[in-house]
Amino acid sequence: MRHRHGLRKLNRTSSHRLAMLRNMSNSLIEHEVIKTTLPKAKELRKVVEPLITLGKKPSLANRRLAFNRLRDRDSVTKLFDVLGPRFANRPGGYLRILKFGFRVGDNAPMALVELLDRPEVEEVENVAEAE
């Protein structure tokens, strides 16, 4: 009986699952929006939201905890310098998961995972219109 087990296995070994969630966390922190399958998105939320909560209190201990989980210096820097102050007044719920249809090859349900309060990309649109 698998009562009270917290994470989905996602048909992977534990090391593969850890590496996959670490890579997806780094991608989400870097790009602020990623497209993935719905079960992976739901598991990613359980990993990234505690990291952003760590980023709200910039201490050396929290930086080391975040680096231990992410293993990427640039992601940790962005987490504490950009995302922590952005979500300082929000008490949780930093991600939005939007259903995004189904994948063509295997009909897997897809999802768009994005950080809330992202800055708008109006500057890029204005440059495109000017050309």
Curated annotation (Swiss-Prot):
GO terms for molecular function: structural constituent of ribosome. Keywords: Ribonucleoprotein, Ribosomal protein. The keyword Ribosomal protein applies. One of its GO terms (cellular component) is cytosolic large ribosomal subunit. It comes from the Bacteria. Belongs to the bacterial ribosomal protein bL17 family. Part of the 50S ribosomal subunit. Contacts protein L32. This is Large ribosomal subunit protein bL17. The lineage of its organism: Bacteria, Pseudomonadati, Pseudomonadota, Betaproteobacteria, Burkholderiales. The gene is rplQ.
